[in-house]
């Protein structure tokens, strides 16, 4: 084996071999086990969140495959409506073209062209991560098969009266001119204002304090053109006498009523709220409660219309509303919403109706793609009536057919499902699944799988029909992911075998948008043999977010994004800066981002390889909590890979070209051999338990502890005295144990660290008589019954003796190479037997020149001592240390440690520092203070021991 472990030299070739040989395919044998990959956006590239989830899924898949299950990890990508359309529109814009000039069909062809060229980025990155997915079954949400499933679902839901078209309030992106989902809305905190406007009371009414007007407080004065009433709280005595009376709406000169509604917060502003149901979600609900009707004043680009749209509170069109014909003041027609705001405020001021303006910090909803404030907008959209489906989907989690890990996320799921609103599924885009609905010239709607089907079903002959221009929300097709990818609506063998799937690995942020909708759709359309609704998956493993080292969310605008491939391959500081500062939305951040990046990564990022990255992600995967990324852990696990590599080289050098007991079973196992076999067995048990309960962090800790501490640090050292001085039978036994434990350890580690384990295994397999092609298809280690528990106890006791001697060496600052005499008193028969039977291990690992039993402590000269149970260890100090010199050395160390303690204590007692420093900095300083206290205490104890000699 090469002297040093070089991931770059092995990873890509190995993956290609695995893929070419079809190892990722279901075996067709054993019980089925399936995981559906959450389909990443076809536009995207893998980020740390993907790397994290994919590591978890691949670990589970490889583990179950090795455990003999018929595993399918289903791969695919999402067409990502808005995101993809924008990418291609930007490319067109760079060539001076728009999609409108190109036309719908040509534009969609362009997107398919782009998808063929660039859609592969993400799949290549998945290969780099070692994802063992079945690439031959790769799906795309716009594939013909999946499109059939989407049309089928739409038609059936429509037939079941669960899909309807209606005019409702939606999040509208005026830049992209489409409805968008709540997930695509980003609330940004901004400095804004509250305007206090006077609305005159009609019919000579007066307020309690004799005023002839009410003052309304608003953050959106421009929407007053569409006001339908003013609301006050029913318990607000100031306005009780005015409920049911009227106001004169300024500028528009309409009479609007004063209503009482519990939604009003009497403490905010003046306690009087203007209500514009067509332009605010809360107002929409108030309008519905009071049947006020709605006045829509903006067009799709958020400009004021000359004539407002008038509607009932349920969305039916009206010619007039309470005598108002919809004509808006002409000075505002065609004005952009924020321009209209300025003009309206100025006009209120001129009319003497502007009471005051106050500064106010506001959360403004922005579209995450269009980058402009979202407008609540009344439009005709298609909706799914989800309440009936939600009941069934809630019950599936309540009765345990679906389990969330960790369980606390079930409450989040329930709170959404019990307050569920109808789902807006139409989008005003061109890229996506076009809605299978057609209109005749009279506006009648016909829903069907194809135009031919619609004509035939409704006897339309050659009546002109126009297909709906809109496409479906991307989440609509991804809600069908678990069954559409397996061939539904056909009843395929795959569907019968792999559905329901076993586990879904996903982020908490899409429990509602994706997980809940998958459960609803699947249970509505998939039935088992008894005709009972089928769930899409039995477990939902919910991951937290991966944040940067300071706990900040990773984002392009903050310039703190880490690319998993940069951890694998490495990147220079200059390249990293260039990457983080390219295409910034706010170019002024460039300098700040560069400064931060160079401070954090002065030398760039070194290559760590895929296995180190995967092991780090696994080790950080504590259930359901956000993870603060830690480069030091990554470096530590890169060292872990080196440790495994070097340990394997030692094993191979000690066993290749030697008899490892394959041909000759005349073997004697040492205590160390029996102990490591038993230790490994308990490691297998604990590791399996951790993976079976989704405690990936524990699994990583168990594997690390055994590999580094027990196998490398202890067992390999314990083999040296046997291999140097043991009998032929003993040497054969130790070599046999070395190769067999290493081979099984590689199998245990393989699901998390596939590359390094496969590479080493190929060298080890002939030594254990294995001729198979790959570690991937080897059985995962099982828990054995026939291990020696006595060997475990004996060896653990001997380790305590060795550690006690090493501690004395450390305390006395003695060279690790200096052989020491050991005197033992108070030894019972068991201790004596353990020492005498294992003198070679003790002498070698504790570096002893002699071992002698004495009758009592009185027979020992001046010594440093330690206790192991009742056994007392004495290391005579004569000739080993100069007492005075050692006391002087310790005194200097104590003074230095005391100085450091005083410095840190002073800093933390300084109120100025504590009040201004970030929490993370204070925590670090407290940690240092605690370490300084421990050091000081240890030095003082050591000084007392030397004085007592």
Curated annotation (Swiss-Prot):
EC number assigned by the record: 6.1.1.9
Coiled-coil residue spans: 877-949
Biological-process GO terms, alphabetical: valyl-tRNA aminoacylation
The keyword Metal-binding belongs to this UniProt entry's keyword annotation: no
Highest taxon, organism lineage: Bacteria
UniProt keyword Lipid metabolism, yes or no: no
Catalytic activity field: tRNA(Val) + L-valine + ATP = L-valyl-tRNA(Val) + AMP + diphosphate
Pfam families in alphabetical order: Anticodon_1 (PF08264), tRNA-synt_1 (PF00133), Val_tRNA-synt_C (PF10458)
GO (cellular component) term, any one: cytosol
Residue positions of motif 'HIGH' region: 40-50
One Gene Ontology MF term: valine-tRNA ligase activity
Class of enzymatic activity (EC top level): ligase
Subcellular location: Cytoplasm
Motif ('KMSKS' region): 553-557
CDD domains found in the cross-reference section: Anticodon_Ia_Val (cd07962), ValRS_core (cd00817)
Keywords annotated in UniProt: Aminoacyl-tRNA synthetase, ATP-binding, Coiled coil, Cytoplasm, Ligase, Nucleotide-binding, Protein biosynthesis
Positions of ATP binding: 556
Family: Belongs to the class-I aminoacyl-tRNA synthetase family. ValS type 1 subfamily.
Function: Catalyzes the attachment of valine to tRNA(Val). As ValRS can inadvertently accommodate and process structurally similar amino acids such as threonine, to avoid such errors, it has a 'posttransfer' editing activity that hydrolyzes mischarged Thr-tRNA(Val) in a tRNA-dependent manner.
Record PANTHER family: VALINE--TRNA LIGASE, CHLOROPLASTIC_MITOCHONDRIAL 2, VALYL-TRNA SYNTHETASES
Quaternary state and interactors: Monomer.
Domain notes: ValRS has two distinct active sites: one for aminoacylation and one for editing. The misactivated threonine is translocated from the active site to the editing site. The C-terminal coiled-coil domain is crucial for aminoacylation activity.
Name of the molecule in the record: Valine--tRNA ligase
């Amino acid at each position: 084996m090469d002297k040093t472990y070089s991931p770059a030299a092995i990873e890509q070739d190995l993956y290609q071999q695995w893929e070419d040989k079809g190892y990722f395919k279901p075996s067709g044998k054993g019980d089925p086990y399936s995981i559906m990959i959450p389909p990443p956006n076809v536009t995207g590239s893998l980020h740390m969140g993907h790397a994290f989830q994919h590591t978890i899924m691949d670990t589970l898949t490889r583990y179950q495959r090795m455990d003999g299950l018929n595993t399918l990890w289903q791969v695919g990508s999402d067409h990502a409506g808005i995101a993809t359309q924008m990418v291609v529109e930007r490319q067109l814009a760079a060539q001076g073209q728009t999609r409108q000039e190109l036309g719908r069909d040509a534009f969609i062809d362009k997107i398919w062209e782009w998808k063929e060229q660039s859609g592969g980025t993400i799949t290549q990155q998945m290969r780099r991560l070692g994802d063992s997915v079945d690439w031959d079954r790769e799906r795309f949400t716009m594939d013909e098969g999946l499109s059939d499933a989407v049309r089928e679902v739409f038609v059936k839901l429509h037939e079941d009266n669960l899909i309807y078209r209606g005019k409702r309030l939606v999040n509208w992106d005026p830049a992209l001119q489409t409805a968008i989902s709540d997930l695509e809305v980003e609330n940004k905190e901004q400095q804004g204002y509250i305007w206090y406007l006077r609305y005159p009371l009609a019919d000579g009414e007066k307020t309690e304090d004799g005023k002839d007007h009410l003052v309304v407080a608003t953050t959106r004065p421009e929407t007053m053109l569409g006001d339908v009433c003013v609301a006050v709280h029913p318990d607000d005595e100031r306005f009780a006498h005015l409920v049911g009376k009227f106001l004169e709406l300024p500028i528009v000169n309409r009479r609007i009523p004063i209503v009482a509604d519990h939604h009003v917060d009497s403490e905010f502003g003046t306690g009087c709220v203007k209500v514009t149901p067509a332009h605010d979600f809360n107002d929409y609900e108030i309008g519905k409660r009071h049947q006020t009707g709605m006045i829509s004043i903006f067009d799709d680009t958020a400009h004021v219309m000359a004539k407002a749209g008038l509607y009932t509170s349920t969305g039916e069109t009206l010619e007039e509303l309470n005598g108002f014909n919809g004509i808006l003041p002409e000075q505002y027609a065609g004005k952009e919403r924020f321009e209209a705001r300025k003009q309206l405020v100025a006009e209120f001021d001129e009319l003497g109706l502007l009471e005051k303006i106050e500064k106010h910090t506001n959360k403004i909803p922005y579209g995450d793609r269009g980058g402009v404030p979202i407008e609540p907008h009344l439009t005709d959209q298609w909706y799914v009536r989800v309440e009936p489906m939600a009941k069934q989907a809630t019950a599936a989690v309540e009765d345990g057919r679906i389990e969330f890990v960790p369980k606390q996320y079930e409450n989040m799921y329930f709170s959404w499902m019990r307050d569920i609103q109808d789902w807006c599924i139409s989008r005003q885009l061109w890229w996506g699944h076009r809605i299978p609905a057609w209109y005749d010239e009279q506006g009648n709607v016909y829903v069907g799988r194809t135009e031919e089907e619609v004509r035939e079903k409704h006897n339309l002959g050659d009546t002109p029909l126009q297909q709906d221009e809109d496409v479906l929300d991307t989440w609509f097709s991804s809600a069908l992911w678990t069954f559409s990818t397996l061939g539904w609506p056909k009843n395929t063998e795959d569907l019968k075998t792999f559905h329901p799937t076993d586990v879904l690995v996903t982020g908490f942020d899409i429990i509602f948008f994706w997980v809940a909708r998958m459960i609803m759709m699947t249970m509505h359309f998939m039935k088992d043999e008894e005709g009972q609704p089928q769930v899409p998956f039995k477990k939902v493993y919910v991951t937290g977010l991966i944040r940067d080292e300071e706990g900040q969310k990773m984002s392009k605008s903050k310039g703190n994004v880490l690319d998993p491939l940069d951890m694998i391959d490495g990147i220079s500081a200059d390249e990293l800066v260039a990457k983080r500062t390219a295409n910034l939305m706010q170019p002024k951040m460039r300098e700040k981002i560069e400064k931060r990046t160079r401070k954090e990564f002065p030398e760039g990022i070194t290559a760590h390889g895929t296995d180190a990255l995967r092991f780090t992600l696994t080790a950080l995967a504590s259930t359901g909590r956000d993870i603060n990324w830690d480069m030091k852990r990554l470096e530590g696990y890169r060292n872990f890979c080196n440790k495994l590599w070097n340990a394997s080289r030692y094993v191979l050098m000690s066993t290749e070209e030697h008899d490892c007991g394959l041909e000759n079973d005349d073997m004697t196992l040492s205590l160390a051999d029996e102990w490591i076999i038993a230790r490994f067995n308990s490691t297998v048990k604990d590791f399996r338990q951790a993976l079976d309960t989704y405690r990936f962090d524990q699994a990583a800790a168990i594997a690390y502890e055994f590999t580094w501490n027990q196998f490398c640090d202890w067992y390999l050292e314990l083999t040296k005295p046997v291999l140097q001085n043991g009998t032929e039978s003993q040497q054969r036994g130790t070599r046999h144990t070395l190769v067999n434990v290493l081979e099984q350890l590689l199998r245990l580690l393989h699901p998390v660290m596939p590359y390094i384990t496969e590479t080493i295994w190929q060298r080890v397999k002939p030594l254990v008589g294995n001729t198979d092609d790959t570690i991937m298809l080897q059985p995962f280690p099982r828990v054995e019954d026939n291990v020696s528990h006595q060997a475990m106890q004996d060896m653990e006791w001997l380790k305590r003796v060795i550690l006690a001697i090493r501690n004395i060496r450390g305390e006395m600052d003695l060279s690790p190479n200096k052989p020491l005499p050991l005197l033992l008193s108070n030894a019972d028969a068991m201790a004596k037997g353990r020492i005498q039977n294992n003198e070679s291990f003790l002498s070698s690992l504790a570096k002893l020149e002699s071992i002698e039993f004495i009758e009592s402590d009185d027979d020992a000269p001046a010594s440093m001592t330690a206790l192991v149970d009742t056994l007392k260890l004495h290391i005579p100090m004569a000739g080993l240390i100069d007492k005075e010199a050692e006391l002087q050395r310790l005194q200097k160390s104590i003074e230095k440690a005391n100085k450091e303690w005083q410095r840190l204590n002073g800093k933390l007692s300084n109120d100025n520092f504590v009040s201004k420093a970030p929490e993370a900095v204070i925590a670090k300083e407290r940690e240092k203070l605690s370490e300084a206290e421990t050091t000081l205490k240890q030095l003082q104890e050591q000084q007392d021991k030397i004085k007592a000699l």
